Regions:
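Short, non-ligating residues that shape and space the ligands of small metal-coordination modules
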Residues: 389-393
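Extended, non-transmembrane interaction/recognition domains
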Residues: 117-375
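Short cysteine-rich clusters marking metal-coordination/redox-active sites
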Residues: 380-386
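Long, leucine/valine-rich, helix-dominated scaffolding and oligomerization segments
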Residues: 1-175
């Protein structure tokens, strides 16, 4: 049974929250302290109903206030609430013409690196059609319906708020179920920051009849394709694992993606739910960012990787949020290139093996052997003119 915890900070500051935020905090604490799966389901349903109502009404402030409060006061309750919020923003049950549909916002991430510029932008009709066909053939369950946004997104172009994300989910879901083109504004998306290594995303929604599997790896002892399944959905066959689906996805979709990313190297990740793939792409891009920075400097400055020094320091306010890596040529005291290595989810400086060890290993693999680790935790600083992070040098 979970240990019951009482947070003095929550009681002392409760009056500063709106009633909606207070109810979210109470529900998250109830779920964190639950003693059974039956009680879990009660709290999960209560939280889901409140969160969906707030997001559908565009009232995200209460959600963010509750998350901020719990993030400072109760880590387990914060985890319960953020999981519920992410679920409400990426999934929904819609009823259309008397049929209930489970709908999920999904993404197919690409980890991309280059010495030049990583593209983002519109997919041609042929490219979008080919990519959609590969979703049906290698990722989605037999009875799934799917709608792909014909755009290769950068992280800067994805919806910034949980309410906006849920709005995109529902629009795409209606389109996937009904077949009409969705109304998604792609003309006013922001410019993309230039990075040597970054993630790109293909975004879509999968919809299935209530309770049916969404992905091929869920189809265990499933019957053949139903009459309502899309014409290009796969026929009945043996169960495919996640690994098999990923292997097939990479082999078949990569030729369609290569023309979208000229001059770039890239890896394809397994298409899956939106938020888990956001975290996975963040995790996977970190070592590529370090390698790309070293590769860029060795070519731009015509030197060997062994002639670079790395200065690594931890940054954060109340805890370590990220490590910053400054790369300094041996004939200079100035940082020539910097890389941010964020800590993700439950990661911390106490992990075994530690994130610092992972950073050291990537630097050594890239040929950088002179590595200095600063012991103290620093307040994050940014350039006053352009807002980019400031990186540690050797002094």
């Amino acid at each position: 049974m979970k240990e019951i915890r009482h947070s003095r900070g929550l009681r002392d500051r409760k009056s500063h929250l709106s009633p909606d935020a207070e109810r979210l905090v109470a529900g998250a604490l109830g779920l964190a302290n639950s003693g059974s799966r039956a009680e879990d389901r009660f709290w999960e349903a209560a939280l889901a109903g409140r969160i969906e109502k707030l997001l559908d009404g565009g009232h995200s402030r209460a959600v963010h206030d509750a998350l901020d409060r719990l993030n400072k006061a109760d880590g387990e309750a914060y985890g319960a609430l953020i999981e519920a919020v992410e679920d409400a923003s990426e999934s929904a049950v819609l009823e259309i013409d008397g049929q209930a549909w489970d709908c999920l916002l999904v993404s197919a991430p690409l980890v991309v690196w280059t010495r030049f510029r990583i593209p983002s932008g519109a997919l041609s009709a042929d490219a979008a059609s080919a990519v959609s066909a590969h979703w049906y053939a290698h990722v989605l369950a037999r009875d799934a319906r799917f709608r792909l946004v014909p755009w290769l997104y950068s992280i800067d172009q994805l919806p910034r708020d949980f309410a906006d994300l849920r709005k995109v989910l529902k629009r795409l879901a209606v389109s996937a179920i009904g077949g009409a083109a969705p109304r998604i504004d792609l003309k006013s998306l922001p410019e993309t920051a230039d990075m040597l290594a970054d993630a790109r995303f293909l975004l879509g929604v999968v919809a299935v009849p209530r309770g049916a599997p969404m992905f091929r790896w869920q189809e265990v002892d499933q019957p053949g394709r139903s009459a309502s399944a899309p014409a290009h959905a796969p026929e009945a066959g043996e169960h495919a694992s996640r690994v098999q689906c990923l292997e097939q996805w990479i082999a078949q979709v990569r030729p369609n993606l290569e023309p979208l990313l000229p001059g770039c190297g890239f890896e394809c990740l397994l298409p899956d739910a939106y938020h888990i793939n956001m975290r996975e792409s963040d995790r996977r891009v970190r070592p590529f960012g370090v390698r790309a920075a070293v590769h860029f400097l060795t070519h731009a400055l015509t030197l060997d990787a062994s002639q670079l020094h790395a200065s690594v320091a931890a940054f954060g306010s109340e805890r370590i949020d990220e490590y910053r890596i400054g790369l300094v040529p041996s004939d200079s005291d100035e940082v020539a290139q910097g890389v941010v290595w964020p800590l993700l989810g439950s990661e911390s400086e106490h992990d075994e093996p530690s994130q610092l060890e992972a950073i050291r290993e990537v630097l050594r693999e890239a040929g950088v052997t002179d590595i200095r680790i600063w012991p103290e935790v620093n307040e994050p600083e940014y350039c006053e003119d352009c807002g980019v992070p400031l990186y540690p040098n050797l002094k």
